[in-house]
Amino acid sequence: MMEKGIWKDALIQSTKKLSPKLQVKNPVMLLVYVGAILATSLYFLGFFGISDEKSGYTLAIALILWFTVLFANFAEAIAEGRGRAQADSLKMARKDVLARKLKNIDDKTDVIEIASNDLKKGDIVYVLANEQIPMDGEVIEGAASVDESAITGESAPVIRESGGDRSAVTGGTTLVSDWLVVRVTAVSGESFLDKMIAMVEGASRKKTPNEIALQILLVTLSIIFLAVSATLLPFTEFASKQAGAGSAISITNVIALLVCLAPTTIGALLSSIGIAGMSRLNQANVLAMSGRAIEAAGDVDVLLLDKTGTITLGNRKASEFLPVDGVTEQELADAAQLSSIADETAEGRSIVVLAKERFDIRGRDFAEMHAEFVPFTATTRMSGIDYQENTIRKGAADAVRAYVTANGGTYPKECDAIVSKVAGAGGTPLVVVRNNKVLGVIYLKDIVKNGVKERFLDLRKMGIKTIMITGDNPMTAAAIAAEAGVDDFLAEATPEAKLELIREYQREGHLVAMTGDGTNDAPALAQADVAVAMNTGTQAAKEAGNMVDLDSSPTKLIDIVRIGKQLLMTRGALTTFSVANDLAKYFAIIPVLFYGIFPQLEALNLMGLTSPTSAILSAIIYNAVIIIILIPLSLKGVKYREMPAGKLLSRNMLIYGLGGLIAPFIAIKLIDMLLTVLGIV
């Protein structure tokens, strides 16, 4: 399951974690730790005749308690070891390299060689093929293939280019081809790689609110059992005198009984469950900024999903030019290409390519034309070009209609019919207007991904509502939403509309998750309970999110929710198992322990345990061994199934609740029989 090196390191760390400074961080296991020290002290006192405690029996109890503490340490060390192994591979990617810092962005020969660790935010660097990108940054010029395998594990190179949503590059990755001009967005020690190493090593892991709440419950239970166990010594002493039979319970037995009754199973595994949950997220190539974000993912009941890349394939391409009456297709194609020349999105480039392929329309001298490009914004929802007293705009139908009307023009009804036809087919219509005259529509074709409908059905079974977010018009959005099977959609989405939608659901008590990659997504990402920023996205988006997806796959949000739910389920299942164990051990041990004083209790010794000594030893051995048995489950997590929360709870209560009640009875009896056969008791 794991490399030998991790096992070996975990064994060493288990011993190092016996330090009181580390043990005090886990109050439940601190109780076992103190009990082991007391039992060891009683053994030595008995060995030298200072105490009446049985030396051999006390030594056995002391050793088992020490092993219980070591097993708990081992569980945590294994989980941490996995993180360290991942961090070590990341550290190999983080090394100081020489960077070419440009003095002037227009002159790529005028460079200063500088160590990557000395780079500052805003510096411009020039990176060539086969060179390592020195620091996190944003591509401002060029396009190149980048090998990101050191960080993502994905061997296939990816394209990084200026403009659009693939402009972010990460320090430590390598250029495979071409060149890039990069603006540095982070300094040494604060880079994405540095943050990732800190997270996977657990250096910045803090206990989550749910962990703290559960630990308070476990400590409360431990204090109650401590109080109960402490009263047994005077109670049994008084009872034995009154009954004239039996003897007072020994201090060793009080310690052993306390450890058996305290919720040590979940206390030992709680930390490893949290660390393993974060590790599973890291293995999915997602970096969580805090454990709180993972827990929130488990409680999410509303998902906001971008249409492009999540529900559809994301590579919308221009497939047709649909002119209005009185306009030729070539005339529309020419205007569409001009409006898209400076558009660095995949859609914009596809328009340029389609115009070239259909009508052999080539580039022109824009300096001579005195052209001024108008970039797309989320507010105007249009882009275009101004040249030689000509104005061309392309954009969403309603945005273009408002633009034409505001400038005194007429928006033809025929265009509405074309837009409706394209939208009804699930495509995206872009209307082109020149000098306030509508020329026609560009048909951008989009394809719904295979299997998404089934995934959304699974989410619905889990009680999660899915909402598609798109900038498309309502007709296009409705067609794609129906085909994909989402519960609702937000069409013609603006940053403000997304933000308000999140706030509306949060006011109703829902937890909301979303993905984003652009600067315009930052406000909504900052507001969402679970905000997954794409690694290729802008720096603003990454800073606003509480998770970063290294693969930049919007569909990863569904997997993140599943991992979050699995973490909460694992913690809940093992807590249920631990508490059920305590109840079973109570009813297994107490009758045997006291039937010397109260013979009537022998009738409750249903398992027929040999003696009080055997009962205590069997229970405390089981208490230690069950921790080791459950370590793989705490690391791997309880298997998650897509079903309603009520059914899932009933299923887990049956498996881990009932299982937790039955397992101790069977195991303790088997251990008791083994101890008797071996002649130990």
Curated annotation (Swiss-Prot):
Residues annotated as binding ATP: D343, E347, F376, T377, A378, T379, T380, R381, M382, S383, K394
Record's keyword terms, sorted: ATP-binding, Cell membrane, Ion transport, Magnesium, Membrane, Metal-binding, Nucleotide-binding, Phosphoprotein, Potassium, Potassium transport, Translocase, Transmembrane, Transmembrane helix, Transport
Subcellular location: Cell membrane
Database matches in Gene3D superfamilies: Calcium-transporting ATPase, cytoplasmic domain N, Calcium-transporting ATPase, cytoplasmic transduction domain A, HAD superfamily/HAD-like
Record's bilayer topology term: Multi-pass membrane protein
EC number: 7.2.2.6
Example of a GO MF term: ATP binding
Pfam families reported in the protein's UniProt record: E1-E2_ATPase, Hydrolase
Class in the EC hierarchy, top level: translocase
Reactions accelerated catalytically: K(+)(out) + ATP + H2O = K(+)(in) + ADP + phosphate + H(+)
Active-site residues from the entry: D306
Recorded family membership: Belongs to the cation transport ATPase (P-type) (TC 3.A.3) family. Type IA subfamily.
Protein name listed in UniProt: Potassium-transporting ATPase ATP-binding subunit
Species in which this protein is naturally found: Listeria monocytogenes serotype 4b (strain CLIP80459)
This protein's encoding gene: kdpB
